[in-house]
């Protein structure tokens, strides 16, 4: 199942994350490190909302959500462009939160794990 959604700059990042989770050893490592279900809800420049569920509690999977976002251990709500910056280490999650650009519902400590997950599962070559 595709995790990409037209109109969202973060779609390629979710594809990369999904590709990283395809490596079961990496997926289990992420599950062990995070142990949470993270719901990521993004809003694009047209105002459309889309959610993805990152299951790092059981099996290390990523799924696009059709309809309302389900409840997870933590939900991250932010703009598409800000998520791209966060995932690419261009901005700190704490800074986004303090500036009101990142809303967190649920377990705040689990929310801090998302940056580490992207670093660990990033399939791009390290230069």
Swiss-Prot record:
It comes from Candida tropicalis. This is Oleate-induced peroxisomal protein POX18. PANTHER family: SCP2 STEROL-BINDING DOMAIN-CONTAINING PROTEIN 1, STEROL CARRIER PROTEIN 2 SCP-2 FAMILY PROTEIN. Its main location: other. Pathway: Lipid metabolism; fatty acid metabolism. Pfam families: SCP2 (PF02036). One of its GO terms (cellular component) is peroxisome. Residues 43-52 are annotated as: Hydrophilic. GO terms for molecular function: lipid binding.
């Amino acid at each position: 199942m595709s995790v990409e959604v037209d109109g969202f700059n973060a779609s390629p990042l979710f594809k990369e994350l999904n590709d990283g989770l395809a490596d079961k050893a990496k997926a289990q490592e992420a599950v062990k490190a995070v142990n949470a279900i993270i719901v990521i809800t993004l809003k694009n420049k047209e105002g459309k909302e889309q959610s993805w569920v990152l299951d790092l509690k059981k099996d290390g999977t990523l799924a696009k959500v059709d309809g309302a976002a389900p409840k997870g251990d933590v939900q991250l709500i932010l703009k598409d462009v800000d998520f791209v910056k966060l995932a690419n280490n261009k901005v700190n999650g704490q800074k986004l939160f303090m500036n009101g650009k990142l809303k967190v519902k649920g377990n705040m400590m689990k929310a801090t794990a998302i940056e580490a997950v992207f670093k660990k599962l990033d399939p791009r070559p390290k230069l």
